[in-house]
Amino acid sequence: MSHAGLDPDAPLKIAYLTYRGKPHVGGQGVYTRHLTKALVDLGHTVEVFGGQPYPILDERITLTKLPSLDTFNDYFPGRFPGFWELKTRDDALEMAWFMTGVFPEPRAFSSRAARELTPRAGEFDLVHDNQCLGYGILKIEEKIPTIVTLHHPITKDRELEMSH
């Protein structure tokens, strides 16, 4: 047994977070698909918690959708959500951040993920946060060991998308 109480040879139950899972542009969706498949191939159990656009995953992997206001979708990027779309506290916060010029997706997603994961803390051995880095991740980390992957600043994703 490890100091964390886990058998180092036993497969892990992993909650994998990706606030955007775009399958063909930006890298997060592609990285998510290949990494989670490799983890399952190694014998681990993986559940992906994702925001729009949702990733395309191996059929052995569960996707738990954490819908956002999707203000930066492909068809109408920067759209202004209607008041009827604000159904939760997280929606209201996402809208407030959006109105102040802040890119709201990571922060809002992390809050949604914390609300979803903290009651389920006993179901997972590890959380892998794929570049979200929002404040909600700190809440999750209080209950479940967490690792983070940071690929590059988010401004690079936008530059790449705008150039194509």
Region roles according to the model:
Residues S2-L12, E47-L117:
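A conserved catalytic-core segment of Leloir-type glycosyltransferases
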Residues P119-F124:
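Glycine-rich phosphate-binding loop signature in dinucleotide/nucleotide-binding domains
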